[in-house]
């Protein structure tokens, strides 16, 4: 049976599985699905059309499934955020849903999002990836399996960071990053 704090707001169409915990002042909007054992700490928000698997932790002030930051987006569009299992979303993490009808921003399994990390619309974050404090993925980016973005790393729209790649902190890239490489600097790119 789900445990919902009396100050939390949960829309009647939201689906809460067994073992879900919703903390004080959290908000779960319409058409949200939450898998077994997932915990929303105080003040966490799951926006409409978000599906999140089992045993996830959504910490305070995280907003998952927010409207995409895309000027042409129509707020009535039924686009999605789909997150897998065993993920950790720490304080202030933001992940936007996709921009077009039926599309989704995708988060795999066992990802770790540190404070204030962000993924834009239509991003794909594969299994075991880590986003350190303040790192950001723009729209339509891909963060490969096991890749690590260090603190304050920016990945430009439509770029991908390959499997197992790791960044230097305070870096930015507007080019694709090869798998199993280290990258850093103001304009990191493939050599």
Report the location of each language-model feature.
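Short, intrinsically disordered, charge-balanced linker/junction segments flanking boundaries
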Residues: 185-191
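Structural signal for interior beta-strand "rungs" in well-ordered beta-sheet cores
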Residues: 3-184
């Amino acid at each position: 049976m789900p445990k919902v704090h009396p100050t939390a707001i949960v829309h009647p169409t939201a689906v809460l599985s067994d073992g879900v915990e919703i903390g004080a002042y959290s908000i779960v909007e319409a058409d949200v699905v939450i898998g077994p054992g997932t915990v929303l700490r105080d003040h966490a928000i799951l926006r409409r059309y978000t599906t999140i698997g089992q045993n996830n932790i959504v910490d305070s002030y995280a907003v998952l499934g927010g409207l995409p930051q895309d000027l042409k987006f129509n707020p009535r569009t039924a686009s999605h955020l789909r997150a897998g299992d065993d993920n950790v979303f720490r304080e202030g993490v933001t992940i936007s849903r996709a921009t077009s009808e039926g599309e989704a921003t995708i988060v795999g399994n066992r990802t770790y999002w540190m404070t204030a990390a962000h993924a834009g619309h239509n991003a794909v974050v594969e299994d075991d990836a880590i986003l350190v404090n303040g790192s950001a993925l723009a729209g339509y980016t891909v963060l490969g399996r096991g890749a690590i973005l260090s603190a304050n790393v920016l990945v430009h729209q439509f770029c991908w960071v390959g499997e197992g790649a790791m960044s230097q902190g305070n870096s930015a890239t507007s080019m694709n990053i090869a798998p199993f490489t280290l990258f850093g600097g103001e304009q990191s790119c493939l050599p």
